[in-house]
């Protein structure tokens, strides 16, 4: 490809509103251009990278015998209403009506559509296990699109779905997909951690995220140094090392605590450590009033809490509801005589405490020396706390390390979450009707590209991993009016183009402009044809090299083959 004919509008400076380094690079390098908030056009350079990534996915899916197909962007609302996700998905769904008033949506994902097709066309256990996938543009009405391709309103995604007759088949499919995903990310040059994750609105109970460490990441993952434990902070577990020595129960005493509306203020006022205080927080789970208890030095993890309560809607009671239900304002709520609560659950940190401080059920009052069983009851003890960095992990008891990261993939064991609701049944070996068992698998392809840039930035540009680089070799000719340079550059272009994608900079530009653009292209190998062309000498440079190295054209083949394989 001749660069003089290649549309690559580069910029010296990134737009002022670009925050993520990947966003800045892709704008400056002429990879993408914004059309509207959260929506981008992929220019030739960006589209080449996108197609390379899609090619890796197609290759790896072929290896595990998963065929590709394509679904429509425009989906009927009725399918999502049937699954119950039409309302649950929330404001991020693009909804519209046609001229006849029929409701539709732009697909953010396609579980319902695949399930409907399977329900109509898969009837016997003999047709399973089966898996399908597509690479397609998705839509999400982000409230605040930002960070370029990392959080857009339109994005490219691989979404795949598996269908099984037994749990064993699902487990095998899940493992195959997980292995394929690891290979995809490795080939794309993106370092990832497979981590325990929350399924969110997707349904199902078991899921694994693929998180790419990056400074701009919006997620936090907790790992140990051996790599034997990794989880999204939303689901991370840790070992609580605090132990209170047993004490004899003291007399329950009510004390005034004016203005102590935080744990810090209360601990200071009563001159007790936060570990001596039990926080009581009222949550509304559908129509149930649930009082949640946790030790004062810990924080409630609402994702874990949501799993425990297993309700369609869970939220902390606001001040008006709190006053109406408990008779107290925030800080005074407590578990003693809390007959108004439908259920009281407590974090495991509350289990072995003695003579603690709890809300007295009255604004600005607390009970001292409250004891479990004597003064209040708990219906269930569960892990609902947020893990803290440095706490021991639950596997090898090593300190947890927190890292910001980008979610680039997510795989789920959906089970029968959709198929039961949507009537996707099959006949088993005994002729009995059973719901198909599903898995769901996704890679944010455009997110993966942003993650690759974030992980492979150089001082002046990017060092693309070789399998997704827009060009493998970038030939830069210094002076276009020198016949010896032109002759050698064209010879190298013809030779290497037989095996690799080659960009030949044949523009009549200054050397500084050419090198600056080459840094933004980020090809694994840059070959500079300059003043020693007549002697059969060129310069080679990798994006991570500090400076170029002279090499004879006789040795160039060996160098290229070593670098590109």
From Swiss-Prot:
EC number: 6.1.1.15
Keywords annotated in UniProt: Aminoacyl-tRNA synthetase, ATP-binding, Cytoplasm, Ligase, Nucleotide-binding, Protein biosynthesis
PROSITE patterns reported in the protein's UniProt record: AA_TRNA_LIGASE_II
Leading EC class: ligase
InterPro entries for the chain: aa-tRNA-synt_IIb, aa-tRNA-synth_II, aa-tRNA-synth_II/BPL/LPL, Anticodon-bd, Anticodon-bd_dom_sf, Pro-tRNA-ligase_IIa, Pro-tRNA-synth_IIa_bac-type, Pro-tRNA-Synthase_IIa_type1
GO biological process: prolyl-tRNA aminoacylation
Gene3D superfamilies: Anticodon-binding domain, Bira Bifunctional Protein, Domain 2, YbaK/aminoacyl-tRNA synthetase-associated domain
Pfam families (alphabetical): HGTP_anticodon, tRNA-synt_2b, tRNA_edit
Entry superkingdom: Bacteria
Compartmental location: Cytoplasm
Molecular function terms from GO: aminoacyl-tRNA deacylase activity; ATP binding; catalytic activity, acting on a protein; proline-tRNA ligase activity; transferase activity
GO cellular component: cytosol
Catalysed transformations (reactions): tRNA(Pro) + L-proline + ATP = L-prolyl-tRNA(Pro) + AMP + diphosphate
CDD domains, sorted: ProRS-INS (cd04334), ProRS_anticodon_short (cd00861), ProRS_core_prok (cd00779)
HAMAP family: Pro_tRNA_synth_type1
Family from the record: Belongs to the class-II aminoacyl-tRNA synthetase family. ProS type 1 subfamily.
Quaternary state and interactors: Homodimer.
Function (record text): Catalyzes the attachment of proline to tRNA(Pro) in a two-step reaction: proline is first activated by ATP to form Pro-AMP and then transferred to the acceptor end of tRNA(Pro). As ProRS can inadvertently accommodate and process non-cognate amino acids such as alanine and cysteine, to avoid such errors it has two additional distinct editing activities against alanine. One activity is designated as 'pretransfer' editing and involves the tRNA(Pro)-independent hydrolysis of activated Ala-AMP.
Protein name: Proline--tRNA ligase
Organism: Lactobacillus helveticus (strain DPC 4571)
Taxonomic lineage: Bacteria, Bacillati, Bacillota, Bacilli, Lactobacillales
